[in-house]
Amino acid sequence: MWIEKNIIIINKSRGFHLITDEIEKKVPEINDFRIGILNLFIKHTSASLTINENADKSVRNDFEYYFNKMVPEKDLNYEHTSEGDDDMPAHLKSSILGNSISIPIKKGALDLGTWQGIYLCEHRNNITERTLSVIINGVNN
């Protein structure tokens, strides 16, 4: 069985945001699968998706801090600057982390590790929403 849809993630400020619960609420079809795979793809070039530590908020703060050190804004060597100081660094950060993730589904639930969560990584300052393409493939209950 296949399921495909788009979902909107609204009003995430710049930073690393745990969205596992939001995904589970907006994609209740996960519960219908005995076994399968969930693929999430973000339809933007200045935000990304990743899976990482879900328990300690300081992990999110550390990610933002070190990504900003690795890929600083206002670098005089950037040529693509017409959309603001945060735009080109956002493209680079997005390329480093990636735009899609795949997660196993088992017995109607995401089969993440104990400390794993899904992150939306927002690399721009003033974004109101992001669109994710959701595809599930598997065997239903």
Positions of PLM-derived features:
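Active-site histidine-anchored catalytic micro-motif
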Residues: 1-141
